[in-house]
């Protein structure tokens, strides 16, 4: 493991996982070695993780002065690591008890932070107390678990001071109490410096009033990620922490407790990776986090790009960069795609609702909406339901709202990892085979000028059905670009030319 020296000469170790821009990761415990973080559910595929072993834990040396285990003094070790890495500013992630440490570092060195990610963070440093009531309330969410009765009895004993057996209440710390969680919990005592842990929280370590005043001046973006089932902190307590920062995002990971990268690695990585990517933003739209990219002058006329099935906002980047010369361009990831939430339930109506919620969240009424394939279907359904919300509508290779003959056969999931949630495919295939008759019967209610673009004879979409679709829209017209299904990616110049002819400058 690489080593460096703290300002007092203590030798400190860290692990490097993955490639890319460094993300310093602080383990919790307190004073637990960083090994329990693993690669944070695969976050190392997006950033190089610099996982620090706090002094006296893991492969880091014990200091000569044991009072240097105090949380307020450990901020100097983060600063020494920043200097060692040669970084002017750092991206910092902290879990659990080290949320306190990261908050103190942010208060003392705000100019050194590029971003701050707080994962199920400790909140003592800012004066937010996790109460016995929080533990009991969170435990009630797990009442249907087979282990609940024994764990709840142990929790009652623990809170009443009749027991100090943390292992008995460990199931509450995990969204799934399976073999992986059991092994993770069992490793905890051997990874923790139990003598140093009390010093971390020593009396006088925290000055919440001073810390909170300093955090109010932190300009770096902050992500606070809470677990739905976590007690320390509960989502409500985590929301109090969010309010202390001027520029903070808040994510509650569903089905997760205190170790969210174990409970659902994909959900955790998508949320954190979206936050850390400077080109990606997130909005909460209808209860779903939607990741999106933005180009162009904020005062320019807005254009929203909706991707097709199994794609994401990146498929639009070349087109978006061209449109951004005279438009404010937004491209977002639908649920179940890219870096947005993957809730597991999908339908064209839900994708329609994603688009609607995104337009409302970004105040984009009257925008031009350009949709490809599935995204076009979502836009079409929205234009029917909300006349006047969309200014102009472009439907590229939209699956026609007429029954397929023959119907699509059952699709087999490809091997390996996917950039989308596989249940999207069978869910939408079922709807394409037998669409709601209302979809086609209400096409005449669309008031937006509409351009329907077909990919010609090499497309898998029946072009005569697209002509039929355009004919049912009062202000609709149909054009062909001989490109197959991926018109905007395979024939971008012709695609842009048709947009200009349609009225987009």
PLM region spans:
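Gly/Ala-rich beta-loop-alpha elbow adjacent to hydrolase catalytic centers
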Residues: 94-98, 102, 371, 375, ...
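Active-site loop/oxyanion-hole signature of alpha/beta-hydrolase fold enzymes
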Residues: 54-97, 262, 270, 293, ...
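Flexible "cap/lid" loop of the alpha/beta hydrolase fold
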Residues: 115-157, 380-385, 391-417
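Short beta-strand/loop motif that positions the catalytic acidic residue
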Residues: 218, 224-226, 446, 452-454
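Conserved alpha/beta-hydrolase catalytic His-Asp/Glu region
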Residues: 151-200, 204, 401-450, 456-457, ...
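Conserved HGGG/HGGXW glycine-rich cap/lid loop of the alpha/beta-hydrolase fold
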Residues: 6-67, 291-341
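Conserved alpha/beta-hydrolase "acid-adjacent" motif
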Residues: 231-237, 459-465
């Amino acid at each position: 493991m690489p080593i460096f020296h703290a300002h007092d000469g203590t030798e400190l170790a860290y692990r490097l996982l993955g490639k890319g821009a460094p993300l310093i990761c602080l383990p919790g415990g307190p004073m637990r070695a960083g090994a329990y973080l693993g690669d944070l559910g695969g976050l190392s595929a997006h950033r190089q993780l610099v996982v620090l072993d706090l002094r006296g834990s893991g492969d880091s040396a014990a200091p000569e002065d044991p009072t240097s285990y105090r949380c307020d003094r450990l901020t100097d070790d983060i600063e020494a690591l920043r200097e060692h890495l040669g970084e002017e500013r750092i991206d910092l992630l902290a879990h659990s008890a080290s949320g306190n440490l990261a908050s103190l570092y942010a208060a003392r060195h705000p100019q050194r932070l590029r971003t701050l990610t707080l994962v199920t963070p400790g909140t003592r440093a800012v004066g937010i107390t996790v109460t016995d009531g929080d533990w009991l309330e969170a435990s009630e969410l797990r009442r249907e678990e087979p282990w609940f009765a024994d764990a709840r009895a142990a929790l009652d004993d623990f809170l009443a001071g009749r027991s100090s057996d943390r292992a008995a209440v460990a199931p509450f710390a995990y969204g799934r109490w399976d073999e992986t969680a059991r092994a993770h919990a069992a490793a905890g005592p051997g990874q923790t410096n139990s003598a140093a842990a009390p010093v971390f929280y020593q009396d006088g370590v925290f000055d919440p009033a001073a810390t909170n005043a300093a955090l109010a001046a932190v300009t770096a973006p902050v992500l606070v990620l809470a677990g739905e089932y976590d007690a320390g902190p509960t989502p409500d307590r985590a929301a109090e922490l969010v309010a202390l920062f001027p520029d903070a995002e808040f994510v509650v990971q569903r089905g997760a407790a205190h170790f969210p990268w174990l409970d659902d690695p994909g959900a955790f990585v998508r949320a954190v990776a979206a936050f850390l990517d400077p080109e990606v933003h997130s909005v909460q739209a209808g209860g779903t986090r939607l990741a999106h990219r933005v180009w162009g002058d904020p005062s320019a006329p807005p254009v929203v790009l909706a991707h097709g099935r199994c794609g994401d906002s990146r498929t639009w980047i070349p087109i978006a960069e061209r449109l951004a010369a005279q438009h404010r361009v937004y491209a977002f990831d639908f649920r179940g795609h890219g870096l947005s939430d993957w809730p597991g339930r999908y339908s064209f109506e839900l994708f329609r609702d994603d688009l609607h919620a995104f337009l409302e969240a970004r105040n984009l009424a009257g925008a031009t909406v350009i949709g490809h394939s599935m995204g076009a279907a979502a836009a079409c359904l929205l234009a029917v339901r909300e006349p006047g919300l969309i200014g102009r509508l472009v439907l590229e290779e939209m699956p026609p709202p007429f029954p397929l003959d023959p119907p699509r056969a059952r699709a087999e999931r490809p091997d390996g990892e996917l950039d989308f949630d596989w249940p999207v495919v069978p869910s939408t295939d079922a709807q394409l085979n037998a669409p709601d008759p209302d979809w086609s019967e209400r096409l005449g209610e669309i008031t937006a000028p509409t351009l329907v673009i077909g990919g010609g004879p090499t497309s898998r979409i029946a072009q005569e059905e697209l002509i039929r679709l355009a004919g049912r829209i009062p202000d609709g017209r149909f054009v062909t670009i001989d490109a197959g299904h991926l018109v905007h990616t395979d024939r971008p110049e012709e695609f842009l030319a048709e947009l200009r002819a349609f009225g987009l400058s």
